């Protein structure tokens, strides 16, 4: 028996052992798998959401009692909407009631109607059972699924017992979905989403709700779990545009500390919506998300940044993921009605400004390429419809040491609407933009310029508040390190500005502590005049640009 057969046999046995533990039910497996021992009575230790507390709960406060009475009074309105769904499914009344709160005994039927699970069950009779059995026999991620199931909603009375009924149903749903949608397979967040559905829906209904949620264009959730999902790119860019517009100082700090590339606030938001805040607020946010669709993601992100503006500007690169999670969790540590009220106001404001949805995705956004690193914004934002540059190493902006006054050229181009900084990238060899390798006959440059007005007419009076630079709006443009094959516009710039005229202004010896880095070595090598003028003759020296760059 060869190594492959031995490994396959071992995996098959491991899979069977895990399945057997769930078939045996609660208290199966090793002692550490048994989980907390059940209480003799849950009467005084379980709140209205099903969360089990270690100590006896205090009596209801007047506010909590009022909220329960209000929820009961709203039940009749939800029953009326369910009874005439075709009339109310796209009405303003449905959205208004979703923000006010969905009664717990209505949430299951309403989620089922919103995700159209009954129709999926009728179209696919018996398919869930087939997918479940196939998953039991061939799942490649059953160990990860088992580990995540053991930590999902363990404080809830449904999932408190290890290998209990709800944990077994959750395992079956995840195994079936892995077999049903191989493109997504299994991701960690799916266990929390499926668990939320299991709180209010039967096992098969919860499975089809998960299928519909990830397949629906309205919710755009599959892009967060699929390696080829194109929705994340558009949502991420739109999020950065919206937050940068409303909170420029916050996003400027995140760019400066390189936190946007380290942990995505939008990705963190999805994680927080699933596991990280109180269950009551989680359910209410999911109610709004299922009704509104992906439009709700931008307002939620905007509120989180707005509430935590001062604390986020103090975030450093030390543990950025943990710090982001803590800040977002603190955002929601307040009254649920207050959060939903601010969310509704933010939704109306963004809808009015057409900032609740990203622009239509471009074809290349559906690829599996990594997410680009955003360029420095300064105090301005990108023009509408623009996209960030391809990913590259994080930029460092050293202070140039000037040895001579660079020549000035007339400014004769038209800026972006609103004075925003535009960044355009072109594929190598694109028509109208010559390839650097073909034009130069030598190594490609290692720097790319953010297009300020028109790249071929870019002036040489580099304006960084120095004694020779009077066009101060140029300080929003900066040098950004990028993949060398993306330096498409260098030949156009060099054609009108010979390198000898510019090198004289940047000829001071380097004192930068990073001159021994691979980037500096590569740039110096490419600056050798072996194949004609080279844009890399622009040496950026010292440590920092003047304040305000």
From Swiss-Prot:
Gene3D superfamilies: putative rabgap domain of human tbc1 domain family member 14 like domains, Ypt/Rab-GAP domain of gyp1p, domain 3. It is found in: Cell membrane. Residues 101-293 form the Rab-GAP TBC domain. Pfam families: RabGAP-TBC (PF00566). Ubiquitinated by a CUL7-based E3 ligase, which leads to proteasomal degradation. Palmitoylation is required for membrane localization and protects TBC1D3 from ubiquitination. One of its GO terms (cellular component) is plasma membrane. Expressed in pancreas, thymus and testis. It is a lipid-anchor. A lipid is attached at residues 318, 325 (S-palmitoyl cysteine). Residues 398-417 have a biased composition (Low complexity). Keywords: Cell membrane, GTPase activation, Lipoprotein, Membrane, Palmitate, Ubl conjugation. Residues 350-419 are annotated as: Disordered. GO terms for molecular function: GTPase activator activity. Acts as a GTPase activating protein for RAB5. Does not act on RAB4 or RAB11. TBC1D3 is encoded by a collection of very similar paralogs with multiple copies of each paralog, some human genomes encoding well over 50 copies depending on ethnic origin of the donor. This is TBC1 domain family member 3E. The gene is TBC1D3E.
């Amino acid at each position: 028996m060869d190594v492959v057969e031995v490994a396959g046999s071992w995996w098959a046995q491991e899979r069977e052992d895990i399945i057997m533990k769930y078939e045996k039910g609660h208290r199966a497996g090793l002692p550490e798998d048994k989980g907390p021992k059940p209480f003799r009575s849950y009467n005084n230790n379980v709140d209205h959401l099903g969360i089990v507390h270690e100590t006896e709960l205090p009596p209801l406060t007047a506010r909590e009692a009022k909220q329960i009475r209000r929820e009961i009074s709203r039940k009749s309105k939800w029953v009326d909407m369910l009874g005439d769904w075709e009339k109310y499914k796209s009405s303003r009344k449905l959205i208004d009631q979703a923000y006010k709160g969905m009664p717990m005994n209505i949430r299951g039927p309403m989620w089922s109607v919103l995700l159209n699970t009954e129709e999926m069950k009728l179209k696919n009779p018996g398919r869930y059972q087939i997918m479940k059995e196939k998953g039991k026999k061939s799942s490649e991620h059953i160990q990860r699924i088992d580990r995540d199931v053991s930590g999902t909603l363990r404080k809830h009375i449904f999932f408190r017992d290890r290998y209990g009924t709800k944990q077994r149903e959750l395992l079956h749903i995840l195994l079936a979905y892995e077999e049903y949608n191989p493109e997504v397979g299994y991701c960690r967040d799916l266990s929390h989403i499926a668990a939320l559905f299991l709180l209010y829906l039967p096992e098969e209904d919860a499975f089809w709700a998960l299928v519909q949620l990830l397949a629906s264009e309205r919710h755009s959730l599959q892009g967060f779990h699929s390696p080829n999902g194109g929705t994340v790119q558009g949502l991420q860019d739109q999020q950065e545009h919206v937050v940068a517009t409303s909170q420029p100082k916050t996003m400027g700090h995140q760019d400066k500390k390189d936190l946007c590339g380290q942990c995505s606030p939008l990705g963190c938001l999805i994680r927080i919506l699933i596991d990280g805040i109180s269950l009551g607020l989680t359910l209410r946010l999911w109610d709004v998300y299922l009704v509104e669709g992906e439009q709700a993601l931008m307002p939620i992100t905007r509120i989180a940044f707005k509430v935590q503006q001062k604390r986020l500007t103090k975030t450093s690169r030390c543990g950025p993921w943990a710090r982001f999670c803590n800040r977002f969790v603190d955002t929601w540590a307040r009254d649920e009605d207050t959060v939903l009220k601010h969310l509704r106001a933010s939704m109306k404001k963004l809808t009015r400004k057409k900032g609740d949805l990203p622009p239509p995705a471009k074809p290349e956004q559906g690829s599996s390429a990594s997410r680009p690193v955003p360029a420095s914004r300064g105090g301005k934002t990108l023009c509408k419809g623009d996209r960030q540059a391809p990913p590259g190493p994080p930029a460092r902006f050293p202070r140039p040491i000037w040895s001579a006054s660079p020549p000035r050229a007339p400014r004769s181009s038209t800026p972006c609407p609103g004075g925003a900084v535009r960044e355009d990238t072109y594929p190598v060899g694109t028509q109208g933009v010559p390839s650097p390798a073909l034009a130069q006959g030598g190594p490609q440059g290692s720097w790319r310029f953010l297009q300020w007005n028109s790249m071929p007419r870019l002036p040489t009076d580099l304006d960084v508040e120095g004694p020779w630079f009077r066009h101060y709006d140029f300080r929003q443009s900066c040098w950004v390190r990028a993949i060398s094959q993306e330096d498409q516009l260098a030949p156009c710039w060099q054609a009108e500005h010979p390198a000898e005229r510019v090198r004289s202004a940047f000829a001071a010896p380097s004192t930068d502590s990073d001159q021994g880095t691979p980037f500096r070595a590569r740039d110096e090598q490419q600056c050798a005049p072996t194949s004609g003028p080279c844009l890399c003759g622009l040496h950026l020296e010292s440590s920092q640009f003047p304040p305000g760059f």
